[in-house]
Amino acid sequence: MGDWSALGKLLDKVQAYSTAGGKVWLSVLFIFRILLLGTAVESAWGDEQSAFRCNTQQPGCENVCYDKSFPISHVRFWVLQIIFVSVPTLLYLAHVFYVMRKEEKLNKKEEELKVAQTDGVNVEMHLKQIEIKKFKYGIEEHGKVKMRGGLLRTYIISILFKSVFEVAFLLIQWYIYGFSLSAVYTCKRDPCPHQVDCFLSRPTEKTIFIIFMLVVSLVSLALNIIELFYAFFKGVKDRVKGKSDPYHATTGPLSPSKDCGSPKYAYFNGCSSPTAPLSPMSPPGYKLVTGDRNNSSCRNYNKQASEQNWANYSAEQNRMGQAGSTISNSHAQPFDFPDDNQNSKKLDAGHELQPLAIVDQRPSSRASSRASSRPRPDDLEI
């Protein structure tokens, strides 16, 4: 009957992701259907057409009578039945492989976040999100998938289709053959000259195999029904249990921590980068917005960063000891820091930009040097 090893290997992988009833169903499918069909049943029906004889010498009469008595061979009919009832299980296996692929991606992302955590980045929120996704997909351990959520629904749908196919093939078999074979078949069909009798080889043996395959189909159908009820109640139990699940009941809405003290955490969670360049002079009407305007933690962090930048800039210019025209205070624009009570805040008085000198860095000409009365460090004292 061909090589069943490919189908057997695929169905064998389903064992690890099935319930107890599903494992029993697969055992029945392997032992009492595939194995028996490939050995005893095939040999019993090996001469079904060659040993079919009719009491006439009319050419072609035996062929048309055999076609009328057996529109499709029992063996080929059972092969189709096995394929159809196995397809829903293979679709469920495809969903399992999809979940396992998701597990690999989540594990890879989790490793990257843990590496970032060792560098001082607070990624607890993102790690918690990955844990919730694993729980949603039914991933408990590496390589182990628990049946819940979408995977459970796929499993229930596969059981429903298997049950429908079992019932459909039983009805088709009953309509075409019945569940027993007669030793003599009467045929009246062209080109037979008259009504002829045709004889079937080993009708009793074939009837026994037909009844046996009927019982196996009924057992498989009963297992599907039991497994369907089990999966249904399991889904209801998981739904009730999910309301008190620690991932949903205790965590609450996920939100980033309000401590933006760490520069890396501030950058990782959407606050302004601690190394973001700030313009020393903002044109009138320009407002520098940093971070999330609705996030109080980022607001505090941005305020401290901007004040420090202005202070550093003032100190650097003062150290240069330059004199000259000063920068108009009108060019120093306040930064906006949204608050609950007011729209904007100016920098504190201690952090206002002091008037600074701007000096032309080009060397002075001789005329300017003579005209200048300002003492220089290299002048001789008299």
Swiss-Prot record:
Xref: Gene3D superfamilies: Connexin43, Gap junction channel protein cysteine-rich domain
GO cellular component annotations of the record: apical plasma membrane; cell junction; cell-cell junction; connexin complex; cytoplasm; endoplasmic reticulum; gap junction; Golgi apparatus
Subcellular location: Cell membrane; Cell junction, Gap junction; Endoplasmic reticulum
Gene Ontology terms: biological process: bone development; bone remodeling; cell communication by electrical coupling; cell-cell signaling; cellular response to platelet-derived growth factor stimulus; heart development; microtubule-based transport; negative regulation of cell growth
Chain intervals for the UniProt region annotation (Interaction with NOV): 244-382
Keyword RNA-binding: no
PROSITE patterns the UniProt entry points to: CONNEXINS_1, CONNEXINS_2
Keywords: Acetylation, Cell junction, Cell membrane, Disulfide bond, Endoplasmic reticulum, Gap junction, Isopeptide bond, Membrane, Phosphoprotein, S-nitrosylation, Transmembrane, Transmembrane helix, Ubl conjugation
Position(s), cross-link Glycyl lysine isopeptide (Lys-Gly) (interchain with G-Cter in SUMO): 144, 237
Transmembrane segments: 24-44, 77-97, 156-176, 208-228
Annotated SUPFAM superfamilies: Connexin43
Membrane topology, record value: Multi-pass membrane protein
PTM sites of type Phosphotyrosine: 247
Side Extracellular, residues: 45-76, 177-207
Phosphoserine: modified positions: 5, 255, 257, 262, 306, 314, 325, 328, 330, 344, 365, 368-369, 373
Quaternary data: A connexon is composed of a hexamer of connexins. Interacts with SGSM3. Interacts with RIC1/CIP150. Interacts with CNST and CSNK1D. Interacts (via C-terminus) with TJP1. Interacts (via C-terminus) with SRC (via SH3 domain). Interacts (not ubiquitinated) with UBQLN4 (via UBA domain). Interacts with NOV. Interacts with TMEM65. Interacts with ANK3/ANKG and PKP2.
Protein name from the UniProt record: Gap junction alpha-1 protein
Species for this entry: Sus scrofa (Pig)
